[in-house]
């Protein structure tokens, strides 16, 4: 072997190539988030307002989709009832991997002021949540900031991550 050649087999392969591919995939995923708009209550009004031209989520690569099979991000906005929990879990399971969840508003985060027998006390009891947005009802700027935080989180993760499925706990 010549002096200017590097023995990659002795060093464990080509980490530069894998790192570059990983960063490329992370960049593509973080800049093309297709969100499932899943509004359940008052926070859905703010989520709809975020789709207006004033906030322009398209410039960040976020496009709202109606089908879970075409979405990577589920934005749950509003109060989740126990009857609706199974349907929410089914929608989450229909989303392709990798998938992320944003819980928007106090009702989605903790059940809000409705501590009744029919309300789920937080979406994280049904599906794993990546970003929590506090407030009642949070402004569209807050949702925009949460999507930017999710983009940063995606860039830090490995491009080939997979989550283990969780059981439905009510």
UniProtKB/Swiss-Prot annotation:
GO CC terms in record: plasma membrane; respiratory chain complex I
Function comment: NDH-1 shuttles electrons from NADH, via FMN and iron-sulfur (Fe-S) centers, to quinones in the respiratory chain. The immediate electron acceptor for the enzyme in this species is believed to be ubiquinone. Couples the redox reaction to proton translocation (for every two electrons transferred, four hydrogen ions are translocated across the cytoplasmic membrane), and thus conserves the redox energy in a proton gradient.
Protein name (Swiss-Prot/TrEMBL): NADH-quinone oxidoreductase subunit B
InterPro entries: NADH_UbQ_OxRdtase-like_20kDa, NADH_UQ_OxRdtase_20Kd_su
GO MF annotation terms: 4 iron, 4 sulfur cluster binding; iron ion binding; NADH dehydrogenase (ubiquinone) activity; NADH:ubiquinone reductase (non-electrogenic) activity; quinone binding
GO BP annotation list: aerobic respiration; electron transport coupled proton transport
Residue positions binding [4Fe-4S] cluster: 42-43, 107, 136
Known EC number: 7.1.1.-
Biological source species: Campylobacter concisus (strain 13826)
Origin superkingdom: Bacteria
Co-factor binding comment: Binds 1 [4Fe-4S] cluster.
